[in-house]
A protein has these predicted regions:
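Short, charged/polar, Gly/Pro-enriched secondary-structure boundary elements
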Residues: 123-127
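Residues that scaffold, gate, or flank divalent-cation-dependent active/transport sites
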Residues: 1-117, 131-139, 143, 148-152
Length: 154
């Protein structure tokens, strides 16, 4: 069965691995105290420890990683900007992105905490082809400040 077969579903998978920090940076982007060149992380309490939950590129380049205790992160990078995790706000942001994706297909499903599935069966030709649709969606999300990984499969 070919990829264009009417019986084969085509799914565009979107993964937003840095949704928590991207959401915060988008919120702060218009303020005068924008983060600039300061490494930033989102932390969450797990088993009586405060751990990095999400981080930006600057924090990665500074040697930080998801799961690292905040105390260790501050020792590595004293100028670190820290935000508390907010799962409700992250979920609302994912819901908002899903609503935005309705412009590409009426069949959008959440894959929490940071993913979406778009059933693009029969829709891709409206945007050129599957490759063009993938580039349009991922490019538009990147332009809006989100780190995104995307793939299409059956």
């Amino acid at each position: 069965m070919s990829a264009s077969s009417p019986n084969r579903r085509r799914i565009l998978s979107l993964w937003l691995p840095r949704l928590p920090i991207d959401r915060i940076k988008r919120k702060l982007s218009g303020s005068s105290d924008a983060l600039g060149n300061t490494p930033s992380v989102v932390v969450a309490k797990q088993h009586n420890a405060i751990l990095i939950h999400s981080l930006d590129d600057l924090a990665v380049r500074a040697g930080l990683s998801i799961g690292l205790p905040l105390a260790n992160a501050r020792a590595i990078c004293p100028e670190l900007t820290v935000f508390d995790a907010d799962e409700v706000a992250d979920r609302k942001t994912l819901d908002d992105i899903a609503d935005w994706c309705d412009r590409f297909t009426p069949l959008v499903a959440l894959d929490p905490p940071y993913g979406l599935f778009l059933d693009i069966t029969g829709c891709a030709h409206l945007f050129g082809d599957e490759r063009a649709l993938l580039q349009i969606v991922s490019g538009a999300l990147a332009h809006r400040g989100f780190t995104v990984s995307a793939a299409i499969a059956s």
